[in-house]
Amino acid sequence: MSSVLAAYEQFLQTTEDRSFGDQQFVQSDTLKAEIPVFVLNTNDPQQRFTLMNFCLRLAVSSSAKSAIKQGALLSLLSLQATSMQNHLMIAARAPDAALRIIEVDAIDPQDYTLTINPRSGWDDIKIRAYRALSRDLPISLADRTVFVSRDAEHAVCDDMDTYLNRIFSVLIQIWIMVCKCMTAYDQPTGSEERRLAKYKQQGRMLEKYQLQTDARKIIQLVIRESMVIRQFLVQEMLTADKVGAYTNRYYAMVGDIAKYIANVGMSAFFLTLKFGLGNRWKPLALAAFSGELVKLKSFMSLYRRLGDRSRYLALLESPELMEFAPANYPLLFSYAMGVGSVQDPLIRNYQFGRNFLNTSYFQYGVETAMKHQGTVDPKLALELGITDEDRVDIMQSVEKHISGKAGDDISQPAGAFTMSLSRSAFINNNTSQDFSGARLSNYEQGWSGTNQDETRDVYPESTMHRLQNIEPTDSDHNELLMPELESDSNPFNRPRFTVRAPLIPEISHQNPTTRMNRNINTRDNTRADHQDTNEDRGSNVPDDILGDLDN
């Protein structure tokens, strides 16, 4: 039997094996769209700044085609390089790339008229057409500019330091839009604004050159549609990762943003490893988990074999990304999400409610995490020299801080699959009575926790006996406030607000039928009093007001 299990494990690992770069398999070339990219032959800061604005306008233009927008973005991503043409050769190596280099000798800052080098073969018609494209901005952009600040586009740029601050401010925003371009590009999560605020605080981004929200969204869609741009960006991130700590300003920025982009689309896999395997709890020995544990082992081996590009499978649209989908290990995924919902409050932001989520194993993960809140790892405790007394003290301290919390505390399971915890109720409802045909008042519903259709009549015990002890001879009994609830050793039985008593304390001794009759009589008496008052004031009050009172 052991040989069969070993063969099964080897079989699963073999199914995940991939052989890359086999020379006997040559892919056929496909048709490619020509992508025009602009290369400036000068390092003048004003000319580069003007070309930056021109490329931004082309990238968000309403009438520009997709290939023109992609070429504008590639030119924009190369404006920080000393030699733009050499930097663009990184993108030229992409299988779908068909770049056409357009050499620009000069560009007019006023109307973005290009002066093209004769080697590029452009005529005046194309120059006028591209100038018209740069003017055709979406109507959603305010002030006919891509920037939030109206005067940012036409500011003077007469030194290199000013230009670098501006181009890096724009490039940071483009890289931020890469983070969610392939996963949740249409879901506003707030992470984009937080990252913008971070780089503003660090001084890497000038607020004056912040792009408008609609402009950033258009740029994000261009990146999402272009495999050439995404392959170029992946190569830039790999370069930033390999150069080390001593690097230039641009690659330091790319390396920082790459931390947000790495392993995008693989959150389920890494969260399962973190909360399912990382804790090393005993439920992993369940027989139901054995097959999925072997699968996870083969997936980890596949991830290592993919090398550096394994972190960017979503950007590269790699088919290996499907191997790491949580549907391949649903039980371990459900258990890990239950554990994570207790241990990490950030799991609330992760949409783990899939159709293959097993609610039983999710609840089991929640129970396991709750039970292990104060436990100590025996191996680490032995390393640290923790005694039995220290272990008990640690467990009691953790339990004291966790058990005394409620609401949105970290110990509450997150998500739609919650479970009832072993805690005392806010109000003790063990003394409920059923009355047919009676409708509870709002006051009674507030204490009983029922809606208007239910017929339970429940009062807190500590208040009931106080109301019953009120003497009927007390002339001020109608103005008494409800006594405060008695102190309870259980913190969850304490009231969260002060409640006033009804104006008639004897209401607690009346059954619902008596209360209903009393309300009817009170309503009739009130109506009669209004009629008597109207008759007395009839000669002094206008007719229209009398009509309102009669109704």
Swiss-Prot record:
Ranges where the record places region Ntail: 405-551
Cellular localization per UniProt: Virion; Host cytoplasm
GO MF: RNA binding; structural molecule activity
Residue numbers spanned by region Ncore: 1-404
Entry text on domains: Ncore is globular and carries the regions required for self-assembly and RNA-binding. Ntail is an intrinsically disordered monomeric domain in the C-terminus.
Family recorded in the similarity comment: Belongs to the paramyxoviruses nucleocapsid family.
Gene Ontology cellular component list: helical viral capsid; host cell cytoplasm; ribonucleoprotein complex; viral nucleocapsid
Species lineage: Viruses, Riboviria, Orthornavirae, Negarnaviricota, Haploviricotina
Pfam families (UniProt xref): Paramyxo_ncap (PF00973)
Summary of the function given for this chain in its UniProt record: Forms the helical nucleocapsid (NC), protecting the genome from nucleases. The encapsidated genomic RNA serves as template for transcription and replication; encapsidation by N is coupled to RNA synthesis. Forms the encapsidation complex with the phosphoprotein protein P. Before encapsidation, the newly synthesized free N protein, so-called N0, is chaperoned by P.
Region (Disordered): 509-551
Ranges of compositional bias, category Basic and acidic residues: 524-538
Keywords: Capsid protein, Helical capsid protein, Host cytoplasm, Ribonucleoprotein, RNA-binding, Viral nucleoprotein, Virion
Organism field: Human parainfluenza 4b virus (strain 68-333)
Protein name: Nucleoprotein
TM annotation in the entry: none
Domain of life: Viruses
